[in-house]
Amino acid sequence: MKKILLSAVSLLLLVSCSNDETSSSTDLATTAHKHHRGCASHEVHEQQLRENPELAAKMQEIERFTENAITNGRLVNGRIEIPVVVNVLYRTAAENISLTQIQSQIDVLNKDFNGQNSDFNQVPTVFSGVKANVGITFVLDAVYRKSTTKSSWGTRDAMKKSKQGGINPTSPTTKLNLWVCTIGGGILGYAQFPGGSSATDGVVIDSRYLGTTGTATAPFNKGRTATHEVGHWMNLRHIWGDTTCGSDLVSDTPTHNTANYGIPAFPHYSTCSGNPIEMTMNYMDYTDDAGMYMFSNGQKSRMLAIFASGGSRNSFAQP
């Protein structure tokens, strides 16, 4: 069983994922890897800690609650249905994505979080015993659109603030807000972990990587950017723990050297202790959309814990 370690580095408030076709953005420096997902977690983490020194302690408390809820079996019972509010910010006609494209993303979330994705059965035998049907559903609640003169929004949450030209979140303690805009810097999307301000809570996805139709662009055109980011919103870490042979705070995922890109050939062995086969098809890795198609049971438990009584997202589980 993988040792689970809790550290300040692993407790990131915000995770920002990128398609590193460019080497930098106005907000975060990234390393160029053409057509690869990438992450500027370190820079964003430092910025959030500078702005909110109390954040680390708050997230450690959420982690303690999560561990206790899992250990004591205090997970939410029954199905959880999450209303999704989509906020579209557009400068061009292409950025003003269609309702069809938006609904295609909701459909992907429902399939991926319920083990109904067509590639779910591709999970290798070695991991078939831990692949999870999370049992969380998503319903499109509303779509708000706003024309803008901005060519890109960056990663400082401007798209979430009407005073900065964005759209304020709608009922963020009971509805998942999803902003769709051009982020810039090659960034695909980012999410706020449980514990952050409700004024900025939710997920941001670049319009070119949302859903499966319209402007969705390969190799990130199967809606898995949102699946990955909603995983972060539900308290999941990257599977490699954001450091070499790190911990994602989940016991049934193997220890990864680092992020995986593209669609790795199976089996792909880690050089970490024990040389485990890496779970490259996990939604919390960095493979192409076609290369990721499972959550683990341990990840399911982490997600369900935050919706339990006393959990940081319990308000979403109320009737």
Residue ranges and their predicted role:
Residues 107-267:
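Metzincin-family zinc-dependent endopeptidase catalytic domain
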Residues 23-26, 205, 256-319:
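Metalloprotease/metallohydrolase-associated module, dominated by Zn2+-dependent proteases
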Residues 1-4:
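Positively charged n-region of N-terminal signal peptides that target proteins for export
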Residues 6-9:
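Sec-dependent N-terminal signal peptides
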Residues 98-105, 222-226, 299-302, 312:
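Stable alpha-helical elements in mature extracytoplasmic
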Residues 13-16:
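C-terminal motif of bacterial Sec signal peptides marking the signal peptidase cleavage site
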Residues 18-21:
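Bacterial signal peptide processing site
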Residues 25-172, 308:
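Propeptide-to-catalytic entry region of secreted or membrane-anchored zinc metalloproteases
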